Amino acid sequence: MSILTVEQIRMARSALGWSFEEFSKECLVSARTLRRIESEGGLDKATPANLKLIRETLEAAGVEFVGGPGDGPGVRLWK
């Protein structure tokens, strides 16, 4: 499992067309917390449990996290 980045979370939420409120309902993490996580440096303040919920929700919605050494972080939609 690759490390999730702020950019990937932003890109995935945007690709799905979800507002913070919609994303919050889907992943059971407060909209305020999601906003904080999506801010620069926000991952440092996120709990492992919240990051797990975010990743699982986005993957269940058809998001694949891509990118590796030499590549920038990205996302791809499968559904």
Stretch-by-stretch model annotation:
Residues 19-36:
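Short alpha-helical DNA-recognition segment
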Residues 48-65:
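DNA major-groove recognition helix of helix-turn-helix/homeodomain DNA-binding modules
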Residues 8, 33-36, 74:
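Residue-level recognition of specific faces of alpha-helices
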Residues 1-4:
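A detector for short, charged/polar N-terminal pre-domain segments
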Residues 63-79:
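Helix-turn-helix/homeodomain-like alpha-helical modules used for DNA recognition
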Residues 38-51:
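Short, charge-rich, low-complexity interaction segments located
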Residues 14, 28, 39:
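Residue-level detection of the helix-turn-helix DNA-binding "recognition helix"
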Residues 9-22:
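Short basic helix-loop element that most often maps to the first helix and adjoining turn
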